[in-house]
Amino acid sequence: GKTPRIIEMWPGLYEKGLFGLAIDLGSTTIAAHLTDLKSGDVLKSAGVMNPQIRFGEDLMSRVSYSMMNVGGDKEMTTVVREAINSLAKQLIIDAEIEKNALVEVVFVCNPVMHHLLLGIDPVELGQAPFALASSNAMTVRTSELDLTEMNPSGMCYILPCIAGHVGADAAAVALSEEPNKSNDLVLVVDVGTNAEILLGCLLYTSPSPRDSCA
């Protein structure tokens, strides 16, 4: 197994609970659920518009912005991390918990949002073969993503992307709903700025970017 890590130390017997965030980092909206890590209960939920929208309303516009502006990817990384911090701060205040008790974050997102969250230039996703810099699941410290409104030694778990424009959000739906285990033919559609379609019993998936529907 993995080597245990100390995330935080409290004096005496600590009974105030430990908490996590489940975040869907979408192209248009960032949605977050604050959860009790012991019970799994969702305590508070909130959402905010993704501030990257000022760089482009859809994913390919943002990739184009990165291509045409030196440091454009870093600008988009900075503003989205700031928005996540603001969202976390709001939830902490609403739930009346201490910042250091927020020790885990799970992110799901499409590949462009995935790259920009991690500080990876998404330019390769703007042209065939739409190569991902990494499609692996990742575990990093919150401090590595400049997430300051939670425990600095806390952990971020980023689910794996599936392919070029099929991201961790689709992977999360597949894990949760398990359409491939149904005896019926199941169609799951994520209707978003970057829509995704999953089809089972066997599992097939495909991106459906908004631009292709215009």
State the predicted function of each range.
Residues 1-116, 123-127, 157, 168:
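N-terminal glycine/serine-rich phosphate-binding loop of ATP-dependent small-molecule kinases
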Residues 30-34, 195-200:
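Short beta-strand scaffold segments in enzyme catalytic cores
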